[in-house]
């Protein structure tokens, strides 16, 4: 649990301070702003890196009942409200999913967690940790209102956002026909959960279509792995096959959306696709237990963010599919075929080796677009958040 605590402290700090620029980065932005037609993109403190940190922190709360993890997420959403819930891209919708997760905790519903906590330095004991025991009644009321406002803001933006000809959400308005794997974990979990919990059939269908369209048009038939994305208008597939984070985005999108799919036929088809993709991904597990930045690049650099997202997606599926209305068969098939306990343990150990002083290293830098994958590795929020979430949930899974 010391590892999870150290990662939690890092994530709690990063979710409050990211992005922060070095002096060198500030100079670069200043120079770029002086070039006609070149304006640096505005910094976004509420984008997907921060939301991934929040997801990891909520997983840490589940594993060890760490009050600082829960307060960090609540404080993050409060800062987002203070800024007026800015939503520039589909990335920001992940905050809506985070708000629904926190709302479930505050209401004491199905998402309330029982944490394994250390008692007086002895072996861990299971105890019910009440959110109301951390937040006072006034705070609970304040945060419930905050969560509802955040969710409403995301739903309103999603309903008004420009769509492709087939009614899907492009990743960026500059390319209105481009569909990215990244968006599957940004749009679908929010749309599917909102649709079920708020009775909005149109958003439920949008979340499902976003997933099924990519399964039909964004995959490499031979390997069963995704391209980074595709052009809806001409059908061209872009990026590399089997980019590690693209696989992670897809698996996360499916794992977090499926529990809220209400049609049995649709659930079965998507759950089967999840199991098949997971099986193909683990065919490329490295000898050291991890995953490369591009899965097939076995002698290339390991990428802790790919490892964290893939591991987190599996751990979330194990947790979330218990809430689904229908039986899950593909998880059982995957576990039988892939010696899952052994391979997930190997992945867990590989992830732990990336951690130095509470920070996850060997994380690939931010992707700049289709086929733009800088070979720069270090410690980034998407590595810290996803590894924290994976290790937290997997440690709890083992204890259970």
Language-model features: locations:
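CBM-like carbohydrate-recognition segments
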Residues: 2-51, 59, 63, 79, ...
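Short, contiguous, pocket-lining structural segments
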Residues: 45, 179-186, 199, 206, ...
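Alpha-helical scaffold segments in carbohydrate-active enzymes
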Residues: 59, 79, 153-160, 186, ...
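Inter-helical turn/loop segments and adjacent helix faces that build the functional surface
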Residues: 64, 109, 194-205, 257-268, ...
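Extended ligand-binding groove/face enriched in aromatic
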Residues: 71, 82-112, 135-231, 237-240
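Ser/Thr/Pro-rich low-complexity tandem-repeat tracts
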Residues: 111-112, 116-120, 124, 128-141, ...
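Oxyanion-binding "anion nests"
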Residues: 249-295
């Amino acid at each position: 649990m010391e590892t999870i605590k150290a990662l939690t402290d890092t994530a709690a700090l990063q979710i409050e301070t990211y992005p922060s620029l070095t002096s060198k980065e500030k100079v670069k932005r200043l120079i770029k702003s002086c070039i006609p037609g070149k304006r640096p993109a505005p910094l976004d403190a509420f984008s997907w890196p921060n939301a991934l940190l929040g997801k990891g922190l909520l997983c840490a709360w589940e594993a060890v009942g760490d009050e600082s993890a829960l307060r960090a997420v609540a404080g993050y959403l409060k800062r987002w409200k203070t800024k007026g819930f800015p939503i520039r891209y589909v990335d920001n919708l992940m905050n809506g999913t985070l708000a629904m997760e926190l709302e479930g905790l505050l209401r004491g519903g199905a998402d309330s967690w029982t944490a394994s906590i250390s008692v007086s330095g002895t072996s861990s004991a299971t105890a019910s940790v009440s959110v109301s025991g951390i937040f006072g009644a006034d705070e609970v009321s304040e945060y419930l209102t905050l969560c509802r406002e955040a969710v409403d803001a995301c739903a309103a933006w999603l309903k008004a956002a420009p769509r492709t000809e087939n009614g899907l959400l492009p990743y960026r308005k500059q390319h209105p026909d481009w569909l990215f794997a990244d968006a599957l974990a940004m749009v679908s979990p929010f749309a599917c959960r909102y649709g079920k919990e708020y009775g909005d059939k149109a958003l439920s269908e949008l979340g499902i279509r976003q997933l099924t369209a990519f399964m039909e048009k964004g995959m490499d038939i031979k390997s069963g792995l995704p391209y980074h994305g595709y052009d809806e208008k001409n059908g061209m597939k872009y990026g590399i096959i089997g980019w590690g984070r693209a696989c992670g985005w897809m698996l996360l999108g499916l794992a977090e959306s499926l529990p809220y799919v209400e049609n049995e036929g649709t659930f079965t088809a998507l759950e089967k696709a999840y199991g098949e993709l997971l099986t193909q991904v683990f065919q490329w597990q490295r000898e050291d237990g991890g995953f490369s930045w591009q899965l097939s690049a076995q002698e290339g650099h390991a990428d802790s963010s790919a490892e964290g997202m893939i591991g987190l997606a599996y751990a979330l599926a194990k947790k979330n599919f218990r809430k689904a209305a229908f039986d899950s068969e593909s998880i059982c098939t995957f576990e039988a075929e892939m010696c899952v306990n052994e391979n997930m343990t190997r992945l867990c150990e590989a992830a732990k080796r990336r951690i130095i002083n509470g920070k996850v290293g060997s994380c690939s830098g931010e992707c700049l677009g289709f086929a733009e994958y800088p070979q720069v590795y270090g410690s980034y929020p998407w590595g810290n958040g996803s590894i924290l979430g994976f290790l937290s949930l997997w440690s709890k899974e083992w204890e259970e």
